[in-house]
A protein has these predicted regions:
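Active-site-proximal substrate-binding groove within the catalytic cores of carbohydrate-active enzymes
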Residues: 57-58, 64-66, 236-385, 390
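C-terminal beta-strand-rich structural cap/linker in extracellular carbohydrate-active enzymes
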Residues: 412-455
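Extended beta-strand/loop cores of jelly-roll/beta-sandwich
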Residues: 438-607, 614-621
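N-terminal accessory beta-strand-rich subdomains and adjacent acidic, glycine-rich linkers
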Residues: 2-84
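Aromatic- and carboxylate-enriched substrate-binding clefts and catalytic-loop regions
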Residues: 148-297, 301, 314-323
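Solvent-exposed beta-hairpin/edge-strand motifs
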Residues: 388-404
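Catalytic domains of carbohydrate-active enzymes, especially glycoside hydrolases
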Residues: 123-143, 210-213
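An acidic-aromatic substrate-binding cleft motif
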Residues: 52-118, 141-145, 480-493
């Protein structure tokens, strides 16, 4: 690794590359800016103002832009009374290397095996390593969309994880054993559930202490309030805070060591404001519904920030394409080799690039310097690409392809330059490493060999095609036919039925793969309409009651292997007094199937339920078309 004390002096190559006289960036800057800094140059005049930002000459304005934005940064920090104390803490410094983060649904079958009834963290992590190089942290998600189905609040849902808190604690330890940090969620919007009469910061901190978590993700927060940090400090536990949104107040940067954010979409990649203000702050880009993540990865690589590799989105599977997975693997490999460079306070975006729509950022130290390069063109670029100041004895490496470079050197002394030739795939990436004379870089040869092995297969040779995951309904064995309705059942007559339903998922789009797939459909979709010729069937007149379920248990001795919360409303193995005819609750799907099999019945399909309730006249509610 590179020595830790990198930045005690000014960067040795903070010089202007010889060129034509640079333009002055004189756009007035307000005290506050949005998530991205303004681009380095003047916006083109009408009619190109909205469609022609690619015309901005970033090379010509870059030096002046960096100068003006450095002044703005200095003054802005003075105005807010900025303190970097939290970034100097050794016990939370890992956040500065938390490059690949994911949100994981606890229902994910790679995380938990319901048959074996055990957490399978190794299986989950091994799959991610195989597909895109693995993760540095995970957000264990046990709340939405299930919250609200009963009175349990966000903390109580964690207590009800398989194995309870001890089971969750072991899962956390299993992640940490593999070098993966663990975040827990907190929801400001959880207001209609059981009130524990304690503030959210106290509830989630106590939970983090109990299971040994490393951080807290603030769902829907644009900055986790300072009360969370003060509560954690009071409990003597170091927690990293990570709001879902970009910080609404720059002052919150002082204790929110991480944040999620979105990428800019301009051809010229924008600089992320928070990263510019505090280079040690880890931004993890999030774009959960993306099917092509190239723009995300280029913005990420240019800014030296991280990514949220979220695929299981509320139970809807949005898997990385092969190309996206391989791209993230290569970026993360470079990041994990040179984490100290990516937090350099002397970061310089918009290094001089000689190819149109190719952009680079410089992350320097006294020992070595990394340039991250992105090709925004939809075609391959090859030739002289990057012009940088040169120091005598410096060696250059193509860190993306794993080979040493022989740049074209010109000038001497302070005017010396190196012109570097690169070959960049269309919409591709590059990385240049400059190592000063006799500078120590541990196992550089091994790293270069690893990158060469990865680069042996170009990114464009991996499939970029996104495909929805197919869904198949598990067949249910038919029950024994009955000519007339058994006791307690009614006959639903045969008929033609327009089955119409629309998904309630609040996010996402109307793509293939979104929501649910019925047996007659070729792919999952949000909206469904299908005419079904229904056969007659018998249907229970009333929901299964507590008394009915008690008869089943008495007759069979049924008891589930996992009995947590099983028949939670019962007392001493029986329904409460007066509850015999109430619908039975706190039974699982497996419990319901076991009861139905004992009763000689089966659970209804969704379209059978809807047909029984809606009838043949298409009414919206069982009683008619108007809400009563």
């Amino acid at each position: 690794m590179i020595p830790a004390r990198l930045f005690d002096s000014a960067p040795d190559d903070a010089r202007t590359v010889p060129a034509r006289e640079a333009a002055r960036y004189d756009t007035p800057l307000p005290h506050t800016l949005t998530a991205h800094l303004p681009l380095p140059g003047k916006d083109p005049v009408w009619p190109y103002i909205n469609i022609g930002k690619w015309k901005i000459d970033s090379n010509n304005y870059a030096a002046s832009w960096r100068h003006e934005l450095s002044i703005w940064r200095h003054e802005h920090k003075l105005r807010m009374g900025y303190s970097d104390a939290q970034y100097r803490r050794a016990d939370t410094a890992w956040s500065q290397r938390n490059f690949v983060h994911t949100q994981m649904m606890v229902e994910d079958r790679y995380f938990y095996d319901p048959v074996a009834r055990k957490y399978t963290v190794d299986r989950y992590l091994d799959d991610l390593i195989h597909r895109y190089g693995g993760i540095d942290s995970v957000l264990i998600w046990y709340v939405y969309p299930n919250i609200g189905i009963d009175a349990r609040n966000q903390t109580e849902l964690a207590y009800d994880m398989p194995g309870g808190l001890e089971g969750l604690k072991q899962a956390v330890l299993d992640f940490q054993r593999r070098g993966v940090r663990v975040f827990l969620p907190t929801m400001a919007w959880d207001n209609g559930t059981h009130n524990e009469h304690k503030p959210d910061w106290q509830a989630v901190t106590e939970l983090a202490v109990a299971v040994g978590a490393d951080g807290v993700n603030g769902d829907t927060y644009n900055g986790v309030p300072r009360a969370f940090l003060e509560c954690a400090d009071g409990h003597g536990i170091p927690l990293v805070y990570q709001p879902e949104g970009s910080l609404s107040s720059d002052e919150m940067l002082q204790w929110n060591l991480q944040s999620w954010s979105k990428a800019s979409t301009e051809v010229i990649p924008a600089v992320h404001k928070v990263k510019w203000l505090e280079s040690r702050h880890m931004v993890n880009l999030e774009n959960r519904w993306a099917r092509d993540r190239t723009n995300d990865f280029q913005y990420m690589f240019f800014n030296g920030i991280g990514y949220t590799s979220w695929e299981n989105v509320w139970g809807i599977w949005n898997q990385f394409t092969e190309r996206d997975g391989e791209t993230l693997r290569r970026i993360a490999t470079i990041y994990r080799k040179f984490p100290e460079l990516l937090v350099s306070p002397h970061w310089e975006p918009y290094s001089t690039c000689l190819q149109h729509d190719v952009f680079a950022s410089k992350f320097p130290s006294p020992f070595c310097t990394l340039w991250t390069v992105v090709n925004r063109n939809e075609y391959e670029v090859e030739g002289e690409t990057l012009m940088v100041p040169h120091n005598a004895g410096r060696r250059y490496y193509d860190a993306w392809n794993g080979r040493e470079l022989q740049p074209l050197l010109a000038g001497d002394g302070a005017a010396a330059t190196a012109t570097i030739t690169l070959k960049l795939e269309k919409r591709g990436f590059g990385a240049v490493l400059a190592v000063e004379s006799a500078a120590p870089v541990a196992d550089l040869d091994g790293f270069m060999a690893s990158m060469a092995a990865l680069a042996d297969k170009p990114l464009q040779s991996f499939s970029g095609a996104w495909k929805p995951i197919p869904q198949q309904l598990v067949p249910i064995a038919p029950t024994k036919p009955a000519a007339t309705a058994p006791v307690g059942m009614v006959t639903i007559p045969a008929g033609s039925f327009d089955f119409k339903v629309g998904g309630v998922e609040v996010e996402g789009y109307t793509w293939a793969g979104m929501d649910f797939q019925y047996p007659w459909e070729s792919t999952a979709r949000r909206y469904h309409r299908h005419r079904i010729e229904m056969k007659a069937f018998h249907f229970d007149r009333y929901p299964v009651t507590n008394a009915d379920f008690k008869k089943f248990i008495d007759a069979t001795g049924y008891h589930p292997a996992d009995d947590h919360n099983f028949l939670r409303d019962w007392v001493n193995g029986a329904p409460r007094d007066g509850w015999d005819n109430k619908p039975v609750t706190w039974v699982s799907l497996e419990d319901a199937r076991a009861y139905a099999q004992w009763a000689g019945k089966r659970l209804p399909h969704e379209w059978e339920w809807q047909y029984a309730a809606q009838g043949q006249d298409g009414r919206i509610y069982p009683w008619g078309d108007q809400w009563n």
